[in-house]
Design a protein with these regions (language model features):
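Conserved structural position at the C-terminal beta-strand
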Residues: 61-63, 165-167
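Extracellular beta-sheet repeat scaffolds used for adhesion and glycan interaction
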Residues: 4-5, 9-58, 96-103, 108-162, ...
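Short, exposed coil/turn segments at beta-strand boundaries within extracellular/luminal domains
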Residues: 65-71, 169-175
Length: 250
């Protein structure tokens, strides 16, 4: 456990005799504390203790003459040190935004990758969250997997990724965080009055021409959003070129 202050509970085989004393030790019997458990309390024990380091809890009964019954013992570990592993090179497999590292994507199903500063301990657990720490999922990354993390996640809306290590005692290391945007809604802007500057065919609007270099003109149904990109293809969509048309261009 990572918590020193505890409530110790136990069930006695019988109620204490009138002059019996219940004693508890948190340091393997080196010192004992008399508990105020009395005959009228029945067989259920509940008492406050404070653990220290790695040791054993002992519980015993001492009678009025000083005779001591057999102690029940339970080893414990108090660990209050959080894992110190950190994370670098956090990435998702399908970052479809304007930059390959902006964590803006249209794809919910992702592979999350990261590099750990050290291999995790045998009892440590790697955890991930896709909703800013609202819920955590234990990953099957093990000590033998080294420092390279690769795990499947499913993004939802706009939130923050968290990655952290939790040890066997429940201590939690510092989380690495990365905001992301999942946007699955396609732009609805349409185009009218599409034209080229030099249409040399039999009609000025038949798009037959003997001129390769053209100025393409069109009217958008609305101004593009601040982060939208207008793209143009001249080969039936096989390849696309980003245009410098901006929000203020109307």
């Amino acid at each position: 456990t990572k918590t020193a202050a505890q409530t110790l509970t136990a069930t006695l085989s019988a109620a204490l005799a009138a002059d019996d004393i219940l004693q508890v030790s948190v340091n393997a019997g080196s010192s004992w504390a008399d508990d105020d458990h009395a005959p009228g309390d029945g067989v259920s024990l509940s008492t406050a203790i404070t653990l220290s380091g790695t040791s054993s809890i002992h519980i015993r009964i001492k009678d009025d003459a000083g005779n001591i019954g057999t102690a029940t013992t339970q080893a414990y570990i108090l660990d209050t040190t959080a894992p110190t592993i950190t994370f670098t090179s956090v990435d998702i497999s399908a970052d479809t935004g304007s930059s390959a590292t902006d964590f803006i994507t249209k794809t919910a199903a992702q592979t999350l990758t990261a590099t750990l500063s050290a291999a995790i301990a045998s009892d440590d657990i790697l955890q991930t969250s896709i909703n800013n720490g609202g819920a955590w999922v234990d990953d099957d990354h093990a000590a033998g997997d080294g420092t390279a993390l690769s795990t499947s996640i499913t993004l939802s809306g706009s939130s923050t990724l968290h990655i952290r290590i939790k040890d066997d005692a429940g201590n939690i290391g510092t989380a690495e965080t990365q905001a992301y945007i999942l946007d699955t809604t396609a732009p609805t802007i349409t185009y009218a009055s599409v034209d080229i500057s030099t249409d040399t065919g039999t009609s000025a609007t038949d798009f037959n021409t003997n001129t390769a270099a053209q100025t393409l003109t069109a009217t958008l149904s609305a101004a593009i959003a601040a982060d939208d990109i207008l793209q143009v293809s001249v080969n039936d969509g096989s390849s696309w070129t980003d245009d410098d048309h901006a929000t203020g261009d109307g």
